């Protein structure tokens, strides 16, 4: 179903649909008049003699060079072609769809000075499935995501390469097969297309959506691990968390209580348990995962604002003046990406400690070593835990902030940059690692719960276990394990594990 975008107020939920489901997007037609007004203003400047950056001047360090009106189209074409300097593998289709949609939103605010023809072409590319081949590397996140967005714009001109119906084609051929016509860029249009944070923001949004899904799944596996270890639910008591006051912590504790409600395992050790306190990885889940939830919610707000922002330069303001600024600088996105990386790292770190607890017979309160039915003859989940440790450590390495590593570019004209693009891109690998860690915890926790038979877990966790066991059977004896890990990770990544429990139990991104 096509999503109608209202620039300035597009909610994260719509952007998530574009990312997860590839839904096309169009601008609400009420924004057409504002787009046309700004385009007319730029056309008037281009026809005159007043120098305005990007309209009739060179770019970056070459901004002082005046360009003749007769060379306007050549200027914009040269800009795009010269900036197609991306390297590396192509970004995934759902990321590129998000980039195109974010560019629609920015242009739709009516401050960029592009013609409606450009807007309609982007809409048609989304509808028909013409997906520009955008290399993953080459942006420093200021002045905008120049190289990635140049590859997008080049396809609109009939240059570069694009995917259409699964085939990689020259840009012009891809457009032709979709029944579309390349555009000849008018004054400032090339600059408007590439001067923006849409690539960084799309990658950061992808990281956010994936991190939130993993965070929700981690509450399910964390609750399951709590039951498998016969851990206490007392630390999840509401009053404890209300006394501290952090919203994420309060919501996380509520989710854990709901997930464990009705567990016979939990009831069995309410009285007479000689253990006074559980290890932190069980007891402090609300404090750790709740803090991560708060971080994700903060970044969600930042990225929702950025998704609706005009990050072009110069801008056509409400009084028709055209003013140069710096909205292309992606520092807010870079900070958000760094915060998401920290949350992803910590969700995985505490989950890995729960995995380690369950496979250690000195900590697991009666479970066999490595959750093997015949330890010694079988190694059980020994190396699955080692894999989770490797993934956790890799994420720790990647969690180093990207935003603090500025370097001057473009002959020192662009002397401070955000590094938002690769800071956001690493979130794809980090969340892939996190999906696998949470998948491994699902395997260890479910195996541990089954060892507690005839005692049973809660109805909600039982539904999650049934979802897991539909694709990964109980480990009766050693077998080729890689498919088990892949299947469990896929349940986290595709949302099946989250979808297995009742709606409303797991916390959303709203509420901060």
UniProtKB/Swiss-Prot annotation:
Mention one GO molecular function: histidine ammonia-lyase activity
| Pathway named in the protein's UniProt entry | Amino-acid degradation; L-histidine degradation into L-glutamate; N-formimidoyl-L-glutamate from L-histidine: step 1/3
PTM notes = Contains an active site 4-methylidene-imidazol-5-one (MIO), which is formed autocatalytically by cyclization and dehydration of residues Ala-Ser-Gly.
Alphabetically ordered keywords of this record: Cytoplasm, Histidine metabolism, Lyase
InterPro entries, sorted: Aromatic_Lyase, Fumarase/histidase_N, HutH, L-Aspartase-like, Phe/His_NH3-lyase_AS
Nucleotide-binding listed as a keyword: no
- Compartments in which it is found: Cytoplasm
Positions of crosslink type 5-imidazolinone (Ala-Gly): 142-144
Kindly give the PROSITE patterns that the UniProt entry links to this protein. PAL_HISTIDASE (PS00488)
* Gene Ontology biological process terms in this record: L-histidine catabolic process to glutamate and formamide; L-histidine catabolic process to glutamate and formate
* Reaction catalysis annotation: L-histidine = trans-urocanate + NH4(+)
Q: What class of enzyme is it?
A: lyase
Tell me, in one coarse class, where this protein mainly resides.
cytoplasm
| Annotated positions of the 2,3-didehydroalanine (Ser) modification | 143
* Gene Ontology cellular component terms for the protein in this record: cytoplasm
The reply on keyword Ubl conjugation is no
| Pfam (any one) | Lyase_aromatic
Enzyme Commission designation: 4.3.1.3
Family per record: Belongs to the PAL/histidase family.
Q: What is this protein called?
A: Histidine ammonia-lyase
Corresponding gene?
A: hutH
